[in-house]
Structures are given as structure tokens and as C-alpha cells.
């Protein structure tokens, strides 16, 4: 079955701090960030911050919260609206566990079309949200960009995706050279241009199984034997330790020991209490040979989620606004 829109959820990270980078970000929690709710991600901007300027980071996860272990394919992530206030937001892809001081990715951003563009054009001039874009460089050579005068959720207007072959910055003015001519004409008043992060597939992942046993075996080559479930998988390093020929304990580096043991005589599917669904499954058919006390299997799981860092910059002297917002859009396919 395909992944449904309502099965794609934004979730917060476990840690939030504006003073200790090592305490900001981290792993995904299973709370939900509801779109349109005040302070769902960032706190209010104080008068002191508006006067002096400020930068804050917040981490979120876009979780494929589907009971079907189907991958979200041809994933595209982009900012689809300008902030109405004087601040601006870019996003940077993260890792399942990184905190603010470990952010290593590059930013992605958005701009408004500055000059009308005709069908067949191979160059765009856009106005970025701030001259700081010249330092951050959220548009880069080789990027896929979205050019559109319609909402990301659909409706009237046009949308197209094109690669850029060169970028130049002059303050907030950004010139983009296109690898292929545009198929449509666009007007400055209604057209936004976004740099796009891409991934071929997003799904739970079961990786790096290592079995330590002299006479036991694990079939890692048969599809479906080892599953990290979209709904319940977390970022974890797991160790299964055999108690005897059939039963084993299950522990994770972050979770510690799970209360219920597993057995090679049945599928092992320990339940994530936050989602009431399994973290992972090891099929009984994947085991063979003879095990003994002390044998171990270690492996890693990764959640079916995109870790995203939002960076909000409030330039010095910014005006106040009661209903500020930033909008990140996701496009993908499933079968």
C-alpha cells in the first residue's frame, strides 16, 4: 500500500538549548510537531534579540509513520514560503543523532524571482531573503531548484525542477544559470525559487549485522529476514546475547536492556512502546546452526525519518511580527 499524507509526521528532537550546543538536537522523539501551532519549534523572539540580532537552531525529524514498511521514493525537500517577518530560515540536513556542535551539512534556502522570466530562459535573477545568503550560499552549482508560481500542495500555476550550472551572489541578489531552458514563463510577483535537498529513498534501515558464534549462522541475504520498521525503528546499536541454545537478551546502547527476551524459535519483534509497533523484526527462519550461551549478534537500526536542522537568523534591528512562520515542503512517491 502507498504511504498516505497523514502518515508523514514532523517530530521534535530530544534536546533543546540555546546556550549549550551539545544539548541541542540529538535523537528523534515520538511527540508530534503540529503545523501552524505557535512556538511548535522556535521560541518567541525577544526585543533584545531583535535589537542585537540572533541565530537559533532547532532540529526536527520528518517521520514516515506508516505501518507499511514501504520506502518513500524520489524525496525532495525545500522551503516553499518566505518568512513574513524580518528574520529568515534556512535548513540543513542532519544525522539521526547529531547535536548542534556537530552540524556538518550545507544550507538550503529560497528566494523570490526578481525579473520576469520567459519560456526558454536559461538564467534567473532572484532576491534572497537576506544578504547573508552570500555567506551561507544556500544555492550552489549542481543543485536542483524548484521554480514555481503555485503552492507546493498543488493548484493553478506552474512548477518545474531544473539543475543549476553556476551561481553568483551580490548581497541578496543571486544569479542562477540553468542547465536546461525553462518550460514556462514566470512573473516576479508570484514566483519563488528554492534549492532542493534530494534522497532516493527514506525507510527504516537494518544495517551492519555482526554475528559472533562458532557454530550458529544468520541469513542476512534473504529479503525480509531482517527488518527495521518504518513506524517503530529508532537510531540504536543493538546487541543480542544468547542465554542458551535458543533464547537471547536484547539491549540497546541508548535504551539499555529490554524486559522481554527473544528466541530463535519465533520471530523476534520487540515493541516500541511509543508507537506500539516493533523496533525491528528478525525472522525465525533467518537462524540456523547451533548457538550457545555467550554468542552475540550486534546490528544497527535507523528510523524512517529525515533529520533536519532549521536555522533562524534575526538580523539586528528587525521589526516585530505576531504571526511569523517558516514552511518546509516534502515531495515524494510510494507504491
Regions picked out by a protein language model, each given a short descriptive name:
Residues 109-119, 192-304:
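Polar low-complexity, Ser/Thr/Gly/Ala/Asp/Asn-rich disordered segments used for subunit assembly
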Residues 1-116, 144-148, 156, 187-196, ...:
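Long, small/polar-residue-biased beta-strand-and-loop interaction regions
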Residues 42, 49, 122-135, 178, ...:
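Short alpha-helix capping/helix-loop boundary micro-motifs
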Residues 55-59, 121-125, 173, 237, ...:
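Intrinsic-disorder/low-complexity, polar/charged segments enriched in Ser/Thr/Lys/Arg/Asp/Glu/Gln
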Residues 1-24, 142-145, 164, 170, ...:
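Membrane engagement elements in two modes
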